[in-house]
Amino acid sequence: VLLGLGLNRLFGPMGILGLTPLAVITAVTNSNGAIYTALAKEFGDNTDVGAIAILSLNDGPFLTMIALGTTGLAKIPILSLAAAIVPLIIGMILGNLDEDFKMLLSNGLAMLLPFNGFVLGANTSLFTIAKAGAGGIVLGLITVLFTGVLTYYLYSLIRRKPDPMGMAIGTTGGNAVAVPASVAMADPSLEPVVGVATAQVAGADVITAILSPILPGFFARRAAKRQQKN
């Protein structure tokens, strides 16, 4: 968010080299829940799997609207914020009211993972990278670096042990592609940058989908080697 704010302050809403503040903030405030869930089953524990409920808050335009509104980059009406978050809150409440219902859904998690992978792969196009250009590639790398690598070291510091699940946050969710248009509906002044921001976010989605499943394994192997030496 600070990176997007600095980009806007220095170069305005059109950004630099085609990389717009709207695209940056959208990409880094939306993660891919399907990738995180799959990686949590392999590299994490029950707390990591359960964290997806909280991480779902950044799936969609809510946090992007909060970031843009609080930094003054956009004027977001309260009703738009409510429309973005209320359905998710209702779903979280309903999912926690019935313990049997909760168990039913939790047991089905393993069945969902292969289908999540199929859907992710079917909707990932390398042509998207070409369309997004250098801006989309750079945005994907920024997302991995600023949300993945930094979160890895933060998680490791808090838990006092190497935690590869921090890298699983460094993704851009597929539904983030629709966020620039959603934000522009709340603040029409952003309409001129919606097209380029959408293409860049789509490019970042593909780049992070490729890198994110690889990097947690790399950090996990590196941590294991260090433990063996000690």
Task: For the regions a language model picked out, list residue spans one by one.
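Hydrophobic transmembrane alpha-helices of secondary-active transporters
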Residues: 1, 88-98, 106-132, 181-187
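Entry/N-cap segments of selected transmembrane alpha helices
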Residues: 1-8, 59-60, 124-155, 198-206
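Interfacial helix-loop-helix linkers and transmembrane-helix boundary segments
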Residues: 13-17, 45-46, 99-109, 124-138, ...
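Structural signature of hydrophobic alpha-helical transmembrane segments
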Residues: 15-29, 74-89, 134-146, 201-207
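Loop-centered beta-sheet repeat module
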Residues: 47-97
